[in-house]
Structure formats: structure tokens, C-alpha cells
Amino acid sequence: MDEAAPRAGCTVWFTGPSGAGKTTLARLVAASLAARNRPSEVLDGDEVRATLSKGLGFSRADRDENVRRIGWVCALLTRHGVYTCAAVISPYDEVREEIRRGIGRFLLVHCTAPLAVLEARDPKGLYRRARAGELRNFTGIDAPYERPPAPDVEI
């Protein structure tokens, strides 16, 4: 039996505040890969929170656990030859680097925009709700976002 050599997968991790374009870019990259017959998946932070991480809150420990869960799925998919595009706020550099080390084949894409632009976009009304005090621990308003010191790409 003649077996083809397995393809190497990779994780492209899109990090940045809400509204910075992470999911849009992840979907575009995955579609481009699929058009080239490369197996690809998108893991969107909002979708994962509603399923795999249902029940987690927004404390530091819960945010870290959410990111680790997504990282574990990315590592599994990458190991099986899938190009995985993860769109996750992932506000803490320590956990992002932990995920990078665990996956190996990993690119970090930092998506950024000025806060005024993010607040003007606000497709889910989250910045407005955070400013009104209706949302607590909102990244970029009353919870920190640690800018990656050395992303592979910054957009």
C-alpha cells in the first residue's frame, strides 16, 4: 500500500480586543487555505465559549482556562494536519506563549485598532455596555489586554 506523507498542520492564532477583526481574518485565511485544498478549521472564541467553555466566566482563571481549552483543540487539529485559525481575545501573554510552546507550528497574529475605532465598530454593543457599567471585566475597558511583545504578524 502506497501511503502519502502526512501533511503538517499549523495554528494561526488571531489575538486582539473585541471588534479588531480576528474572526473576519480567521475566516478569510481558512477559506484561502480551503481553496488550495488544505484542510482548515476556524475556532471562534465566542462560539467556543457557548459550547466547550460554557459555564466559564471572565475572571483571570476562567479566561486562562478558556484559552487553554482552545489551545488544546488547536494542538490536536494541528497534529492531524489541519490548518487551524483561532480567533480568540486571549488577553494574557503568558497563556498565549504557553499555547505556542504546546503547539509548535504556530503563528501569532495581533489584530489591533485604536480604542475609538473599536468602540465605533462595536458590532455586539459590548463597549457601550461596558462603558455603561452593564458588563464587568471587559477586555480593554476594565480588564487588561497584554499586547504581544513580538507577534509574527500585526494587522
Regions found by a protein language model. Name each.
Residues 19:
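Walker A (P-loop) phosphate-binding loop of P-loop NTPases
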Residues 25:
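Hydrophobic positions on the alpha1 helix immediately C-terminal to the Walker A/P-loop
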Residues 28:
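Active-site signature of alpha/beta-hydrolase-fold catalytic machinery across serine-
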Residues 34-51:
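Short beta-strand-centered segment that lines the nucleotide-binding/catalytic pocket of NTP-utilizing
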Residues 51-53, 59-109, 127-130, 134-140:
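Glycine-rich phosphate-binding loop used to anchor ATP phosphates in small-molecule kinases
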Residues 112-115, 120-155:
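Small-molecule kinase domains that catalyze NTP-dependent phosphoryl transfer to phosphate-bearing small molecules
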